[in-house]
Amino acid sequence: MSYPEGHKVIDLMFGLPDIKGLHAAYETFKPLYRDRESKDFAFPAQYMFKDIPNIEDLGDDPVGWAVKQMDRFNIEKALIGVNVFSELHKVARDRFADRFIFDVPLDPNGGMEEVRRLRRLAKEYDVRGATVFPCGCNPQVPINDKRMYVMYAACVDLDIPIFVNAGVPGPRVPMFPQHVELIDEVCWFFPELKFVMRHGAEPWEALAVKLMLKYPNLYYSTSAFAPKHYPKAIINYANTRGADKILYAGYFPMGLSLDRIFTELRDVPFKDGVWPKFLYENARKLLKL
């Protein structure tokens, strides 16, 4: 049950160190906030994340710096978003094509314009997925909303998974759009869709496990959770019937440091046979790497 030192990793949630780009993305959430403290936060869930990595003053090669951090922890490849507020993803594509794969963050409120953008970017980048933050859209978009169905259909057509935040969101915005029970209808209607839950699915992690047992193309990634806070239901599922369904995802540099993540991973009680799948094999198969 010990962590396999030196094992290669695929990180399914990694960010490039562009503080201006990250803050510009966070600004899109602010119209949803009602409390004064949230409006003053530099990071949307700052009340939960106390030791956010410092990515200021990294010199003139921030992408190269990020690759060096990946090397420290045997991260072979990282999934990064094509951030409309930053140009660093272009640098990553042009200089480190063997280290980065891409997802396209979508706002389902955009309808077919978003679908066309997804298709265009899929030709320009090594796009292996799409992402949606239902509670962070403005207006919010529930997981089973008709606006989401357009995005799901496009992902099925492109044969890429969609990564969707599930459970109570960290930012202080209404939670209903991310209720895990809404995933049931989506997986029923789109049996071909590969759907990956992000950001915990709490407090409905037991329901998330039931749905993963029910639907073969439903997965769970550990994004935005320090390993010491991985839900017990998820660890138990990985150690029993779900070894092929649970995937490693970090949250660097948005909220967690790689040092903290990989230090705490050593205390996660996964069985020996689970670790290679969790860290690497499940992502490799899902993303067809």
Put a short name on every predicted segment.
Residues 59-69, 110-122, 205:
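Short, acidic/polar
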Residues 1-12, 19-72, 77, 242-247, ...:
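Mid-to-C-terminal alpha-helical segments outside catalytic/metal-binding sites
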Residues 9, 78, 100-102, 162, ...:
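Hydrophobic/aromatic residues located in beta-strands of well-ordered beta-sheets
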Residues 68-76, 96, 157-158, 189-193:
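A structural motif corresponding to the C-terminal end of an alpha-helix
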Residues 76-77, 83-170, 177:
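Active-site gating/metal-coordination segments in enzymes
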Residues 17-19, 85-88, 109-110, 137-138, ...:
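Active-site environment of divalent metal-dependent phosphoester hydrolases
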Residues 128-129, 142-247:
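Catalytic pocket-lining loop regions of alpha/beta-barrel enzymes
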